[in-house]
Amino acid sequence: MVQVPEKICLALRAAILVFALAGCATAPPPALISQDEPAPVPEPPPPPKIALVLGGGAAKGFAHIGVIKSLESHGFQPDILVGTSAGSVVAALYAAGYGGFELQRIALAMEEKAFSDWTIPNRGFIKGEALQNFINEAVGNRPIEQLTRKLAIVATDLQSGELIVFERGDTGLAVRASSSVPGVFQPVKFNNREYVDGGLVSPVPVKTARDLGADVIVAVNISDRPKLSRLKDTIDVMMQTFTIMGGIIAEKELAFADVVVEPDISALNSANFESRNQAIIEGEKAGLQALMKLKEKIAAYYEAKNAQAVQE
């Protein structure tokens, strides 16, 4: 038998040992996968961003407070508030942190003369500074971007006719601009531009709410309806014309809202503060009637999001 030198034997043994260790390092035993492990649960979708859009309508705007009370009583809190004209007043106060009952208390205690700083007619009978000061005092002089809720206020550029959205800056000034009915309030001058009532171009600013990222939009329409009775004079004819024009614009925007709330306030006078309590009551009624539709829209949102997550 051939004798293998001892050194060669030791070298062979070392080589075999190295290869064996290398095999252990590069080829670990396969992991055992249980067939009973459940599929990973998808992350729940984020809650929908709910926007409350408050339209214009002068003294009928008190109905917005009733709608807010109804929504609050059933746990609905909007993430985004958008207001135009009278709706901007309520939207600003609500965005500042006032609840529905607090808004009602403020509404019933306010006096019309507090907003009526009459002046010699030049380009309007009312300056609007009193309204601006009232709002700023009520919100603690906070600018729009520092309010409790996201707020957007719509006005109209008097020179270009463009829709302008205030998302920052002086809250009272924005509300004043949005509420400056041409011929009644003086136009609001700001940054070398002049602004008037937002209801001229967007009586119920649904599109603005969608642009701000709202998933579910609740729009409150308090616009006047055309009168079916005989129009007595020139003023009646002019007002009827404006009502028809505003109604057409409002209908186009409302078509893109998820929930439309329309309080029964046709019998109330837009210029009469004395009917404010009745307006609030009618707003509450309409808000309650809209709750089921709102719940359905929120459920549909979650259903769509969950279906999207499964596909991904």
Report each predicted region and the residues it spans.
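N-terminal secretory signal peptides that target proteins for export/translocation
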Residues: 1-8
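Patatin-like phospholipase
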Residues: 2, 13, 24-81, 93-312
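Alpha-helical transmembrane segments
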Residues: 8-15
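Gly/Ala-rich beta-loop-alpha elbow adjacent to hydrolase catalytic centers
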Residues: 83, 87
